C-alpha cells in the first residue's frame, strides 16, 4: 500500500521527509529532516546537517512529504501510537 494523504495515519513514518510547523519549543519550528525512528510517542528526526532531534508527537504539527512529493500537514495527536497499532485500529 502506498503512502497517500488518506492513509498516512496508518503507515510507518520512517523514511519520510518532515518539517515541524508548530511546536512548543519555538527553536524547533521550521526544522526539516528525515524521520529515522518512530516510537509510540516520539519521532526521531535527522536534519540535513546530521543533527538528531527527538520530538514528542502530541506536542506538534508536522508537514510530511510523501514519496510522490505531495505535502501533508498532520497534528501529532493523530499519529500517536506505534504504526502497527494504528493499523490495527483501521482493520477493526
Swiss-Prot record:
UniProt KW Nuclease keyword: yes
Enzyme class, spelled out: hydrolase
SUPFAM superfamilies in alphabetical order: Rof/RNase P subunit-like
Enzyme Commission number(s) from the entry: 3.1.26.5
Reaction catalyzed: Endonucleolytic cleavage of RNA, removing 5'-extranucleotides from tRNA precursor
Any Pfam family hit: RNase_P-MRP_p29
Top-level taxon: Archaea
Any one biological process term the GO annotation gives: tRNA 5'-leader removal
GO molecular function, one term: ribonuclease P activity
UniProt keyword list: Cytoplasm, Endonuclease, Hydrolase, Nuclease, tRNA processing
Compartments where found: Cytoplasm
CC per GO annotation: cytoplasm; ribonuclease P complex
Keyword Cytoplasm assigned: yes
Subunit structure: Consists of a catalytic RNA component and at least 4-5 protein subunits.
Family that this chain belongs to: Belongs to the eukaryotic/archaeal RNase P protein component 1 family.
NCBIfam families: RNaseP1Mthb
Function: Part of ribonuclease P, a protein complex that generates mature tRNA molecules by cleaving their 5'-ends.
Record's protein name: Ribonuclease P protein component 1
Source organism (scientific name): Staphylothermus marinus (strain ATCC 43588 / DSM 3639 / JCM 9404 / F1)
Amino acid at each position: 500500500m502506498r503512502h497517500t494523504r488518506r492513509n498516512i495515519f496508518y503507515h510507518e513514518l520512517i523514511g519520510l521527509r518532515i518539517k515541524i510547523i508548530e511546536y512548543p519549543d519555538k527553536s524547533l519550528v521550521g526544522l526539516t529532516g528525515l524521520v529515522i525512528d518512530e516510537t509510540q510517542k516520539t519521532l526521531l528526526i535527522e536534519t540535513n546537517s546530521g543533527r538528531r532531534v527527538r520530538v514528542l508527537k502530541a506536542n506538534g504539527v508536522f508537514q510530511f512529504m510523501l514519496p510522490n512529493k505531495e505535502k501533508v500537514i498532520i497534528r501529532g495527536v493523530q499519529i500517536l501510537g506505534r504504526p502497527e497499532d494504528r493499523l490495527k485500529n483501521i482493520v477493526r
